[in-house]
Amino acid sequence: VGHPLIERLGELQPRTADEAHAREGSPPTLLVLPGSRRSEIARLSEDFGGAIMQVRAAMGPVEVVLPVADGREMEVRSAIAGWPIHPTLVHGEAEKFAAFRRARAALAASGTVTLELALSGVPMVVAYKVSKLEEQLKYLIDVPSIVLPNLILGENAIPEFLQKECTPEALA
């Protein structure tokens, strides 16, 4: 019994001191992971774009890297077209994990990627939005968190923002 990510632990190593020092003088890297489903990308992109702008206003320049799930590039490009900052899109697992090693922080949709980020040592904020109909199901489900690492830890160590709580201000 286990999780398939255990087999990939070698790829999920936190960045080394050498990698951290090599990036000195460069703007910090912010990973943006809006999900792999069309509905996730559509529901989260506006709030993620607003959060990026607030982070940039508070911290100055940031390098934004957005790993694109297989088959979702068109949806992602459409969803981020209105963002005033243009993220670097990366494809495939190798590029995604390389971006993890460069990242200072991540803004992520809830899902398996939160476990990948945790195993990689990347601090994150997690967001999720569902349809009004799906939101009604919350009354049938009793879980303390939607973030896999929080469930594993048994505590809410990673901030999560759902539905109306998912705003650019909260995410930034």
Enumerate the language-model features and the residues they cover.
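Nucleotide-activated sugar donor-binding and catalytic core shared by glycosyltransferases
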Residues: 1-172
